[in-house]
Amino acid sequence: LGGKKYRTHQHKEYLSVEDTIPDVQEAINAEQISESQYNSEAVDIEKLKTHLPVVKIETSEEIPGVPYYEEGYSHRKYTTTSEGESELAATMQIIDNLDTYNTVNDKPAVSTSIRIRVRGNTSRWFDKKSYAVTTVDGDGTEQDRRIMGMEAAHDWVLHGPFLDKTLMRNYMAMNFSGELMDFAPDVRFCEVILNGAYQGVYVMMETISRGKGRVDIARPNLTKNVTGYIVEIDNATSLPVSALNNFTKYVSV
């Protein structure tokens, strides 16, 4: 996002369709596939072999930020950690080999502590969650890390395409935008494993934020009356309780 682009075609030259198909079939447990809901046991991660980066996240408890409605309240609330925090301390490893396939047992290119939470608005209700990830050091201080060839930063988004069954819509939109303007987030496809369970194909995304390789504006200077800024339009209203169709089931017509 901003400056030199690192947009890449993620099907590497040494790979072929013939090589990929048998490996994919070997990792899939066909009897565990469901038409109406996700089953993490449908993929045997020990047999997973992919040209996409593999993101492994380990947590000590459920990731906070899942929405729920409480009796007597007309607006939604969000789950917190067992200590009442909105973010959970966790670890993340990224396996991203340059000249061979990626498997869960390969040496990680990135190994870091993180803070993580569920992100989104209505998308928080989807079966496939998206996550806000902050890379930190051992004492919890934000630590910039370069991930999948993108500019070093500490705030990232793991976007889980859900309604878009092609998984490509946001990925393509960001890449097209990046060819037309400077300030479009870089993106990378990846496969996510959470606590040993396969979660599917995700998109690792830069956030729109101030910094080198992001939006190149200076921090506010209290001695000057001119400054750069980013405007964020967010939803600050409390939504009433209502049923949400998350489109997980299909009907033949």
Model regions: which residues?
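Phosphate/dinucleotide-binding and metal-coordinating scaffold of catalytic cores
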Residues: 1-253
